[in-house]
């Protein structure tokens, strides 16, 4: 009976969260540069809660707003940039779960659905072709491997140039798509601040929290911001290195990083980012955990990385009063 009560309460809370959402498009009409997109967005829902679990083939970017109850609101807001290797949004873990956690602590959460790679149906394997071995690393034309495929460990972070980890410079399509996602994040920052009074948000307390590829998008939006309205008040990246060359902004933007030491390339990339920030005289905090590589799940409480959210929240309150 107790378990049933907990389950019902969880479902009711999830339903309340969904009913309280606002979804706003970032652009009027088609997003600039996506005029030729013909793919259809795909959405997967959690069969238990009915909440969105995963999104792919996004070409119409938007923000989804999750606001805390007015009696808890602190005025702080976090724009959540989910991970998924630019192929999908890990919306359930990186947005829905994180938004609920932040709302409970009085922080507004805004899920950013930035543009992704178009997903095409898998092509049939040519007759006689050998299956690709598990763990084999893809190569670009010409046989050269992109930086993220060099399999660097954290001790080799100095081999990364200005934190640029992925995509490779000669991956024109990857660079173009990354810039579209970065543009989406900059527009999202402006849009959130334009609604600050309506949503009970302090426009000076709005920042990014990105996961994996979403961390790269958040970093890109920060280092390419051209106006005060686009510059975040803080930047946090969770196992997400930069996807472009980094020129640390002159504006003060405190940086928070969390990753796992054995998450090869990623750990090296974010350490390089940390050093860039410190060399520029900026505030930066980094947590590198010893447990196995991969994403931080919601049930990691028994692992060293299970404390990352509390560390982020303490850092946020210390940095943004």
Where are the language model's segments positioned?
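Short amphipathic alpha-helix adjacent to the substrate-entry channel of hydrolases
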Residues: 92-111, 275
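Short beta-strand element of the alpha/beta-hydrolase
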Residues: 74-83
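C-terminal catalytic histidine-bearing segment of alpha/beta-hydrolase fold enzymes
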Residues: 283-321
């Amino acid at each position: 009976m107790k378990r049933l009560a907990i389950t019902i309460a969880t479902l009711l809370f999830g339903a309340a969260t969904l009913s309280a959402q606002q979804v706003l498009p970032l652009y009027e009409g088609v997003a600039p540069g996506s005029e030729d997109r013909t793919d259809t967005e795909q959405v997967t829902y959690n069969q238990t809660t009915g909440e969105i679990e995963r999104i792919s083939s996004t070409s119409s970017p938007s923000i989804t707003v999750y606001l805390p109850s007015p009696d808890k609101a602190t005025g702080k807001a976090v724009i959540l940039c989910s991970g998924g290797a630019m192929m999908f949004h890990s919306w359930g873990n990186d947005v829905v779960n994180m938004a609920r956690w932040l709302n409970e602590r009085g922080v507004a959460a805004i899920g950013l659905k930035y543009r992704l790679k178009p997903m095409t149906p898998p092509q049939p394997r040519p007759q006689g072709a050998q299956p690709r071995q598990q763990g084999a690393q893809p190569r670009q034309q010409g046989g050269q491997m992109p930086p993220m495929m060099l399999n660097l460990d954290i001790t080799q972070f100095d081999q990364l140039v200005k934190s640029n980890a992925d995509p490779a410079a000669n991956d024109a399509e990857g660079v173009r798509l990354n810039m579209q996602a970065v543009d989406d994040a900059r527009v999202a920052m402006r849009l959130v601040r334009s609604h600050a009074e309506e949503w009970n948000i302090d426009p000076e307390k709005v920042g990014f929290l990105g996961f994996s590829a979403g961390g790269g998008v958040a970093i890109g939006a920060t280092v390419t911001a051209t106006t005060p309205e686009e510059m975040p008040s803080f930047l946090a990246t969770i196992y997400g290195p930069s996807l472009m060359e980094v020129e640390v902004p002159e504006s003060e933007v405190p940086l928070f990083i969390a990753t796992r030491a054995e998450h090869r390339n990623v750990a090296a990339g974010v350490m390089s980012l940390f050093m860039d920030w410190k060399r520029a005289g900026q505030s930066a905090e980094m947590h590198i955990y010893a447990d196995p590589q991969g994403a931080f799940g919601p049930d990691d409480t028994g692992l060293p990385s299970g404390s990352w959210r509390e560390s982020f929240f303490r850092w946020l309150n210390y940095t943004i009063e």
